[in-house]
Amino acid sequence: MLIPQPPLGKRRQQRLHSTAMRQVGQRARAATPGVVVGVISDTHGLLRPEAVAALAGVDVIVHAGDIGSAAVLEALRRIAPIIAVRGNNDRESWAASLPEIVKTDVGGIRLCVVHDIKRLGGDPASEGIDVVISGHSHRPSVERRARLLLLNPGSAGPRRFTLPVAVARLHVGPAGLRAEIVELGAPRPPAR
């Protein structure tokens, strides 16, 4: 569990978010064969050491909301640049600058990140989106709909019911996209 830290000022939050977005954009443009995106959601203020270990070595981290505290984002930022959206439980002042939806390019693919997929309007595929990343349900899933990949890493925070505690990795490379759910406490996935 993270030790609570004082909330960041609004300007500092905005500066950190835009710096991470610039770093992500630079990495995407300069991407060599293979980019690994770490995907996490629903931490609810708890960043498990197993989640940190599962995300080690990724090129960028996506947090799909219900972060719980600015300290979670700060700890993840020490691993890799972050793309984050606000979840329905992210109501404190530290989360005010986080968007509800982010559409961005990473490693030559177009991502759309939203906490609750039900809040995503329209047809993502018609907008050129390759992958929709969401959270909220706490149920890890990888689903293909034609050329669109839907990825929910599940919850990496406090266990809910009998659902697994998990994160995901999205591998982007010349051979296409590959998503994997990483249950925490299970053996670490092989290196790319």
Regions from the PLM with identified roles:
Residues 95-118, 186:
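Metallo-beta-lactamase
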Residues 2-82, 90-100, 108, 163-166, ...:
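N-terminal active-site segment of His-dependent metallophosphoesterases
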Residues 42, 76, 104, 113-115, ...:
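Generic structural signal for conserved hydrophobic packing positions in ordered secondary structure
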Residues 86-87, 104, 153, 182:
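Short, structured secondary-structure boundary patches
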Residues 41-45, 65-67, 88-90, 116-118, ...:
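Active-site metal-binding loops of divalent metal-dependent hydrolases
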Residues 179-191:
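Short, solvent-exposed aromatic-acidic interface loops
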Residues 69, 171, 185-186:
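General structural signal for secondary-structure boundaries
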